[in-house]
């Protein structure tokens, strides 16, 4: 009987040892797949750098919005003096949205708990010949910038057409401000504005000439075509 117990104990020990070895091997292979099959995790140092960048972006954008909201009355007065009533109404709506954004970004944020901080960079994009890297959150925001730019551009172009004003997207208040939909997160404001203006220019052209070359209309709104957006953004995957 004692001999049977000893044999059973040995068999059990071997089974446990084999199971542990198998689990350790799978765990090791899993780690290897994590690095080989995808980007490495964001280091603690890079996480701290991102937190600092996000804090600085928010500070800068709050200051920018404070200045812009103060300047809206002057811009509206200029449009009224030029008798551009359609553009004046469009500018009022744009100013109201900026005021809402100003309220939204006043809330405090716990940056360390935000998924953006630990999400690896997987995309590369270009601004003025300079390459940048970003993660899924930044890529989604770039797409939003282009689409919002197109929508606001269409409205501005349509307003200038109705006012019988010259083709002049570069002096449209929304084009100059160019942060509609930005929240001080994921991207530098200048990068967001760059792509917002790319969408705006095309939307303005469609609105001014009363056509849909670069976008489509649905439910009373306008959005840029997917292939046009892809051509503007030209995101590449980081290998």
Task: State each model region's role.
Residues 14-22:
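C-terminal segment of classical bacterial N-terminal signal peptides
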Residues 11-12, 61:
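Extracellular, intrinsically disordered low-complexity regions of secreted proteins
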Residues 21-239:
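Glycine- and aromatic-enriched low-complexity segments, predominantly in secreted/extracellular proteins
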Residues 1-8:
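Bacterial N-terminal signal peptides that target proteins for export
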């Amino acid at each position: 009987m004692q001999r049977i117990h000893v044999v059973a104990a040995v068999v059990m020990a071997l089974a446990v040892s084999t199971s542990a070895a198998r689990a350790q091997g799978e765990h090791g292979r899993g780690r290897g797949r994590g690095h080989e099959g995808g980007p490495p995790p964001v280091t603690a140092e890079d996480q701290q750098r991102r937190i600092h960048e996000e804090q600085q972006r928010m500070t800068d954008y709050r200051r920018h919005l404070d200045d812009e909201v103060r300047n809206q009355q002057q811009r509206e007065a200029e449009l009224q003096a030029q008798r551009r009533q359609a553009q004046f109404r469009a500018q009022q709506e744009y100013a109201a949205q900026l005021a809402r954004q100003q309220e939204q970004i006043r809330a405090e944020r716990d940056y360390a708990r935000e998924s953006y901080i630990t999400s690896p960079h997987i995309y590369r994009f270009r601004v003025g010949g300079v390459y940048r890297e970003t993660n899924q959150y930044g890529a989604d925001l770039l797409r939003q910038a282009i689409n919002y730019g197109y929508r606001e551009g269409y409205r501005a172009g349509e307003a200038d057409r109705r006012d019988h004003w010259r083709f002049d997207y570069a002096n449209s208040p929304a084009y100059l401000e160019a942060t509609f939909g930005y929240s001080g997160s994921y991207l530098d404001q200048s990068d967001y504005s760059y792509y917002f203006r790319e969408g705006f220019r095309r939307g303005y052209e469609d609105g001014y000439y009363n056509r849909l070359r670069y976008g489509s209309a649905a439910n009373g709104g306008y959005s840029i075509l997917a292939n046009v957006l892809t051509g503007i953004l030209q995101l590449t995957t980081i290998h």
